[in-house]
Regions:
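Short, surface-exposed acidic-centric catalytic microdomains
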Residues: 621-623
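Residues forming the flavin
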Residues: 1-603, 615, 627-640, 657-660, ...
């Protein structure tokens, strides 16, 4: 594409008072811009009309908007997709954070424009990846309440849906549920659940195809091109689908492990699931002797919130126990009912059910249960630490003890997947994702056959950065396999996952990325002639987007890709690039920075800022009128994981005095939009020492800092402290070479 460049400089919003537009026009002239205009109201209708006229009459096809942050006015500065657009941030990151009229302020603006022009020249319009055999079908795995709801809602939205259930009948956990907690005012009365009605609705929906007594034998391919093998009654069927909802639910925690609660010592110590089955079957009797239950005690958090068992709260157990206590009070208001609890977590309107049970005479005892024993007369007594009195107490004798066991996601069942060991000499890897071979999806992915799980085995992702997401593009867990939740939440979760699946097939079929770079039409391209089969890209991709062939060559799957560029940062041969983002592009942007010689005493600091948290924080610092060191030159990157170490070498060779990597927080409470890009960058920094030793430079010249988007008020001190440290080291000895 032969480029004809138009540069449009805004002098409004204080930019013109802070920076000389004529000096910026001169920079545009240095880069052979065919058109250069300055306007006090560049986002106004008249100015936009002039830009469009230049496109039509002057043949401008590459546009630089030197004005406000690229994070704003995206709908205003929106040009045809065959035009290349570059936004240069003169407002938030120059005019609003630097003193007006200063030489350093102008030099910062000039470098920002130079870098923008280089990026523009290196960019090409993205060509979306679109295949002829894309599918928009939705596969739902799991035929319980969540799965049936997801399938029904997706079909009602007009999408063909395939539902796979391992049992012969649909329903999952709710097949054995007697009644449900209240969801309507006055939130005191339990509600009936008609599974047959939901099943009938599903059966009558023409867009739903149901496989029962079946399992997913394998899933290969990528979003809109998932090839699914479904095994049923010894036969195998093939389906091509666009996205997958995983709704395989959870199972109760194994009560046999609860020896401290005497499970297994008496048949009258049962689980909440056992009691639900009793009520469903209409036969609620003591297992020991078949007599009616005259009194009952519930022990909450049986295994949950316990570091020896399930460290987390299972969310629904409290309300389930309140519901079951209500069963007894409805049958006979005189039945003694005890509930032993740590905390009653009856959120929202469930609090009204809790209050109703207090009115019904249920006795609540707050404290940890220390023992359940036979009283010698064929009944049970519970010993507990009473939080209110600080003393141990013993309950009245009861006929039945119900343990409210927690929930374990089906994704947490199975043996750990063994990750291939890194090649000898490879850098220390970031901790691998925890994947268990649970036989839910059987993915044909290089990084493992199932969704990666978080700390407790739930295949969720960061709840702020990735709502409803997983670490595998196009696969959305829902219901209790995603997180602990109750029936009502599971139904809502099913609809959310169905909507995400629909969003995915629509975006991918148009050649666009999904969250977080939603709408991006670029994708990584591989120059295979230089590939050394080092496996760095296949191992480090956070989303499992790259498989390998038998010779360890990377096999990219463009529709799995989230466009983070982590593979680009990983590649030592620099064979991976995007149409609008490449190693050479950023390297040339660094090389275009004007670096004064050492006698001018104007050091230059390169800031590689993650576009997701760090760059917005820099914007917010400017919006808040906070000033920081004028030696800083900011280049936004898709993710710190996309930073290739050659950029560090380029910057130091250029004479840049210090390099600062500003990215998202990593670790257990990570905030990286690409999961572990920031962590990967931190790991790669271990190689920087080797580079600096080779260049005979101090290691303090390169630093990485983690910031949240809310840390904008800390930005000035962070940058000023770094500038002070670099200044104390003296000029980069490569300056001027």
């Amino acid at each position: 594409m032969e480029k004809k460049i138009g540069v449009y400089i805004c002098s409004g919003c204080g930019i013109g008072e802070s920076i000389d537009p004529e000096a910026l026009s001169a920079v545009a002239g240095e880069h052979s811009a065919a058109v250069c205009r300055t306007d006090p109201f560049l986002c106004g209708a008249e100015s936009l009309a002039r830009i469009k006229a230049d496109i039509e009459s002057e043949g401008v096809n590459s546009i630089v908007i030197a004005a406000c942050s690229p994070r704003v006015m995206t709908d205003v500065f929106d040009f045809p997709p065959d035009k290349v657009l570059e936004r240069v941030n003169l407002r938030e990151q120059v005019a609003w954070c630097q003193p007006a009229g200063e030489e350093d302020t102008l030099m910062m603006a000039e470098d920002a424009l130079r870098m923008g022009l280089v990026r523009l020249k290196e960019s090409q319009p993205p060509e979306p990846f679109i295949a002829e055999d894309f599918s928009k079908k939705i596969l739902v795995v799991g035929g319980g309440l969540t799965g049936m709801t997801a399938a029904l809602e997706a079909a009602r939205a007009g999408y063909e849906t395939i539902l796979v259930e391992k049992e012969e009948k649909l329903g999952g956990y709710v097949k054995d549920v007697y009644r449900l907690p209240p969801c309507d005012p006055p939130y005191e009365n339990l509600r009936d659940f008609n599974l047959e009605d939901l099943t009938a609705k599903l059966s009558s929906e023409p867009g739903v195809k149901v496989y029962t007594g079946a399992m997913v034998a394998s899933v290969s391919g990528a979003p809109c091109m998932f090839d699914v093998e479904i095994r049923q009654n010894g036969a195998t069927s093939s389906e091509r689908v666009g996205a997958i909802v995983l709704a395989t639910g959870s199972v109760p925690y194994d009560a046999s492990k609860l020896t401290s609660l005497s499970y297994g010592t008496s048949p009258d110590i049962i689980t909440a699931r056992d009691l639900e089955v009793m009520f469903k079957g209409g036969d609620v009797k003591r297992p020991s002797n078949g007599q009616p239950v005259g009194s009952v005690a519930f022990v909450l958090c049986a295994g949950s919130r316990d570091p020896e068992h399930l460290p987390y709260c299972s969310s629904a157990c409290c309300v389930e126990s309140l519901k079951q206590a209500r069963y007894f009070k409805e049958a006979n208001p005189e039945t003694p009912v005890y509930i032993f609890y740590k905390d009653i977590r009856s959120t929202g309107n469930y609090e009204l059910l809790y209050k109703q049970l207090q009115k019904d005479g249920v006795i609540f005892v707050r404290g940890g249960v220390t023992g359940i024993d036979d009283d010698g007369s064929d009944a049970l007594v519970i010993t507990s630490d009473d939080v209110l009195t600080g003393s141990p107490i013993m309950s009245e004798s009861v006929d039945l003890v119900v343990l409210a066991t927690g929930m374990v996601p089906t994704s947490a069942l199975g043996e750990p997947f063994k990750v291939q060991a890194p090649q000898e000499g490879a850098p220390a890897p970031v901790a691998s994702d925890a994947i268990l071979v649970s036989n839910l999806l059987n993915l044909k992915y290089r990084q493992g056959p199932e969704l990666p799980g978080l700390e407790y085995g739930f295949p969720d992702s960061h709840f702020i950065c990735f709502p409803y997401e997983s670490r595998r593009t196009g696969i959305y867990p829902a219901g209790t396999v995603r997180a602990p939740m109750d029936y009502q939440q599971a139904g809502t979760d099913a609809m959310g996952a169905a909507l995400k699946a629909i969003q995915c097939v629509e975006m991918v079929s148009a050649g666009k990325a999904v969250h977080p770079r939603a709408g991006d039409q670029s994708y990584p391209e591989f120059f295979m002639q230089r590939c050394t089969q080092c496996k760095r890209c296949t191992e480090e991709c956070p989303f499992g987007a790259i498989n390998e062939d038998e010779k360890a060559n990377p096999l990219p799957n463009p529709t799995r890709c989230r466009r983070c560029g982590v593979c680009m940062g990983a590649c030592p041969e620099r064979i991976i690039s995007f149409k609008n983002y490449s190693v050479g592009m950023i390297g040339n942007m660094i090389k275009t920075i004007n670096v004064p010689d050492e006698y001018d005493e104007k050091p230059r600091l390169l800031v590689l800022a993650c576009e997701n948290d760090a760059y917005p924080a820099l914007d917010m610092a400017g919006i808040s009128g906070l000033s920081y060191n004028p030696w800083v030159r900011i280049i936004p990157v898709r993710c710190l994981g996309s930073v290739n170490l050659v950029w560090i070498a380029d910057a130091l060779s250029k004479g840049i005095d210090g390099i600062f990597l500003l990215g998202c927080r990593h670790g257990n409470d990570y905030q990286c939009h690409f999961i572990k890009g920031s962590e990967l960058a931190n790991t790669r920094m271990t190689k920087i020492q080797e580079t600096l030793d080779r260049l005979a430079l101090e290691s303090d010249r390169v630093k990485m800092e983690q910031v949240a988007i809310t840390d904008f008020n800390l930005i000035p001190k962070i940058l000023d402290d770094f500038a002070e440290k670099v200044n104390s080291l003296g000029p980069n000895p490569y300056k001027g070479f």
